[in-house]
């Protein structure tokens, strides 16, 4: 029992520590970071956000903004950037966000290319075709999407609405620069969209953490994100705790004890047969532990 409690406490600590952004911009009527230490520069136009809150999102119509963010991960350091986007036009490229230097592998940005039919390329831009991660996805105007781009020092990933679109390993990134831009790619401005809740992390969030971030911030009434089993290492995990215990089978000597249902996952897949009673038999590693009634 002590081992189980220590494991859950450790997992909870990792989850809380890893999912705290180093900078966050909510665009709730201003361009300031959530801690009011820095701000984007420019004359903004604010519109309803994905929940319908007035002046809760920033409208970018062929207009860009920049901010000096000293917390932007440099070189090949791990990182995650997430943002909510609603496109008002999809017939031209939307340069959502970026930072770094316009040189081979020294850039880190997010682009949604112009639509071709009902689809479009979502791009994690690293400056240079060999440094980009490109995934073709359906694209519709007037719908809010949540994007996440991550890099752990080796593996680059791009997500939308909690779903992993593409993962590429082996790209050596040497990102250099502390100016964060929205609405432009290097010196070129091209965007017609509303953006909200831009967050910068100094860790590469796991697949499970990205799904959790999407589910916890999507507007009410949104369809659940489609999730798929994906390859690649899972370096951090998230634990969900229930408040009301449920009874489960136990030896005769413990029939008066009440326990919770514990499910164990590794790399997005449930480990069949793993539960609270035999968690100590699992091989060494990092797991997602789900506790429920």
Regions found by a protein language model. Name each.
Residues 68-72, 134-139, 169-171:
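Beta-strand-rich interaction surfaces with strong enrichment in secreted/lumenal proteins
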Residues 122-146:
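Short, aromatic/His-centered strand-loop micro-motif at the edge of beta-sheets
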Residues 231-293:
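C-terminal outer-membrane/trafficking sorting elements
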Residues 142-151, 158:
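Short tryptophan-centered beta-strand motifs in secreted/extracellular beta-sheet-rich domains
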Residues 77, 142-143, 283-286:
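A glycine-anchored, Pro-Gly-centered beta-turn/N-cap motif
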């Amino acid at each position: 029992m002590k081992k189980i409690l220590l494991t859950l406490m450790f997992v909870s600590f990792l989850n809380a520590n890893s999912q705290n952004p180093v900078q966050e911009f909510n665009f709730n009527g201003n361009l300031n970071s959530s801690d009011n230490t820095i701000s984007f520069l420019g004359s903004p136009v604010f519109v309803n956000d994905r929940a319908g809150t007035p002046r809760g999102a920033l409208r970018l119509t062929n207009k860009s903004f920049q901010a000096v963010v000293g917390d932007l991960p440099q070189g090949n350091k791990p990182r995650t950037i997430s943002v909510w986007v609603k496109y008002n036009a999809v017939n031209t490229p939307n340069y959502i966000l970026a930072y770094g230097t316009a040189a081979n592998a020294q850039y880190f940005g997010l682009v949604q290319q112009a639509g071709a039919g009902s689809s479009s390329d979502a791009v994690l831009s690293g400056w240079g075709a060999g440094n980009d991660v490109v995934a073709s996805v359906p694209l519709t105007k007037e719908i809010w999407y949540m994007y996440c781009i991550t890099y752990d020092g080796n593996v680059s990933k791009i997500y939308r609405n909690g779903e992993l679109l593409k993962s590429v390993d082996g790209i050596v990134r040497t990102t250099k620069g502390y100016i964060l831009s929205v609405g432009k790619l290097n010196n070129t401005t091209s965007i017609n969209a509303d953006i909200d809740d831009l967050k910068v992390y100094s860790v590469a969030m796991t697949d499970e953490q990205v799904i959790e971030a999407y589910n916890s911030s999507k507007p009410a009434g949104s369809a659940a994100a489609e999730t798929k089993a994906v390859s690649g290492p899972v370096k951090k995990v998230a634990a969900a705790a229930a408040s009301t215990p449920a009874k489960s089978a136990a030896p005769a000597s413990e029939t008066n004890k009440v326990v919770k249902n514990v499910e164990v996952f590794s790399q997005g897949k449930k480990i069949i047969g793993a539960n609270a009673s035999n968690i100590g038999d699992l091989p060494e590693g990092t797991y997602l532990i789900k506790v429920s009634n």
